[in-house]
Amino acid sequence: MEIKELFQKFYPNSNISIMELCPCYDSAQSFYGKAKVIEIENDVFLISYNTIVAFYNRETKIAEVVDTYSATTLRHIKEFLRQSGFKAETKKQIERDYMKEVA
């Protein structure tokens, strides 16, 4: 199932916008299509290697990171958070500020 089809199941009457994450803060020239941003109403999701890894809500200004997975995905997350106006310095800081502890 394509990512857009998956999101349409959860947001059936919403306009879904999908775009590539382009590096502004990272030294890379491109993420080569491996990082995508999906915007649906007030929700913004980061997809890295076809996995939802982070999201934030524009209204509540709350961001959450699911997991940092790999070094490359961490770079995608840092870029996404920075472009969205959030602090993103180190893996430790991101995990502390944006990941929920699992009991």
What residue spans do the PLM features occupy?
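Terminal leader/tail segments of proteins
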Residues: M1-A103
